[in-house]
Amino acid sequence: LNVYGFITTPDTPLLLFFSLFLFAYKNYLTKKNTVSYLLLTLSISGMMYSKYQGVLIVFFIVLSNWKLVKDYKLWLVCLGVIILYIPHLTWQYINDFPSIRYHLYERASVASYRIEYSLMHFVNAIAIIGFTFIIIYKAFFRGIKSTYLYHKGLNYIISGFFIFFLLSSFIG
C-alpha cells in the first residue's frame, strides 16, 4: 500500500512503455539484435506519447552508459522514434505548441519559493513508496555502486528522477 496509489492510474501507459523499455534495454545489453532495437523504438515512442517525462528515462540511461552513443543502430532507433512521433509534433505545431505554452508560461506557479516545497519532496518520496520505504531505500543504496550496466541504469533513473524533481521543487 502507498499513499499515492490512485495517482498511478493516469500513468499506466507510461508504466507499460517504461517496463517495455527496461525489458528492451536489458535485451539490448545482452543480445543487440533486431528485436531489441525495434522494442527500444516502440517503447521510447510510447513513453514520449504517454508523458514527456519519458525523455528523462532515456536521458538517465544514456548518462549511465555513454557507450550507447557509439552504436549507430541506436541512432537509427532515434530516427525511428522521431518518425513515430511526427504526428504529435505536427499536432503541436498546428495548435501553436499548447504543451510547451502550458508548462513554461501558463501553469500556475508560486510567486516566491518556500522551504516547505522542497521538504515535502522528501516526505512525498517516502509516501509514494509506502510502508516498505525502508526496505526499498536500503536496497537502492546497497546497489548504488553496481557496475552491471542494467543495474547502473536503474540507479541513474531513480537518482535522476529524485534529483530532477527536487530541483524543480525550488521553482515552486
Regions found by a protein language model. Name each.
Residues S146-F170:
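Transmembrane alpha-helix segments characteristic
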Residues V35-K51, V62-L63, V81-I83, F162-L166:
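Membrane-interface alpha helices of multi-pass inner-membrane proteins
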Residues D11, N33-L40, Q53, K73-V77, ...:
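Residue-level signature of transmembrane alpha-helical entry/exit and packing/kink sites
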Residues F21-Y37, F140:
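Membrane-interface transmembrane helices that cradle and orient dolichyl/undecaprenyl
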Residues T12-L20, V58-F59:
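Membrane-embedded alpha-helical segments of multi-pass membrane proteins
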Residues I57-H151:
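Transmembrane-lumen/periplasm boundary regions of multi-pass, lipid-linked membrane glycan transferases
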Residues N2, L22, I61-N65, H88-Q92, ...:
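Structural signal for membrane-spanning alpha-helices in multi-pass inner-membrane proteins
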Residues V3-P13:
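Short acidic/glycine- and proline-prone juxtamembrane loop motifs at membrane-interface regions
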